[in-house]
């Protein structure tokens, strides 16, 4: 003779509702706390191309010589990021880039503007150790500055995207190719 043995739960509806209530409290508490805590004030700081971690930065100055100050974001450990109005400036330093032109083409994808392949026929603008390329489909401009001296194997990479991309990419180009460099 076979007997089927089943363990029946020892608690009823009240216990189930208690478990559901605890789950709602645990899952809902972060949302309530987030709503109660005010948003942090934006951090305004001077835009500096490059990276202090590598000991190489180029301070951005406006055409009138004043420091360019924008809202800085700290959400990406690989790049420094500022928002100037609705335009974004991202910068990083890469090491040992053997093909500077290819590195510049790749950086547009690398900082999150898009994963599409940039047309190889898009011309690059060169001036001494600086390069610039525009990706109009992604509304982005990438600019690089190849290092020399103690920064010989380093390259500052900058990607500018957004509605005022041309204004800020021209400003970056001016700073990396002229006396704006520090």
Residue ranges and their predicted role:
Residues 26-56:
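C-terminal region of N-terminal signal peptides and the immediate post-cleavage residues
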Residues 3, 38-44, 70-155, 161-182:
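Conserved polar/disulfide-associated segments of primarily extracytoplasmic proteins
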Residues 6-36:
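Hydrophobic membrane-insertion alpha-helices, especially the h-region
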Residues 6, 55-57, 169:
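Compositionally biased, intrinsically disordered low-complexity regions enriched in proline and serine
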Residues 15, 24, 31, 53, ...:
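Polar low-complexity intrinsically disordered regions enriched in Ser/Thr and small residues
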Residues 22-23, 62, 121:
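A generic structural signal for solvent-exposed, polar alpha-helical segments
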Residues 13-14, 53, 63-65, 79, ...:
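Intrinsically disordered regions, especially transient/low-confidence alpha-helical propensity segments
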Residues 53-74:
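Proline-anchored loop/turn motifs at beta-strand termini and strand-loop-strand connectors
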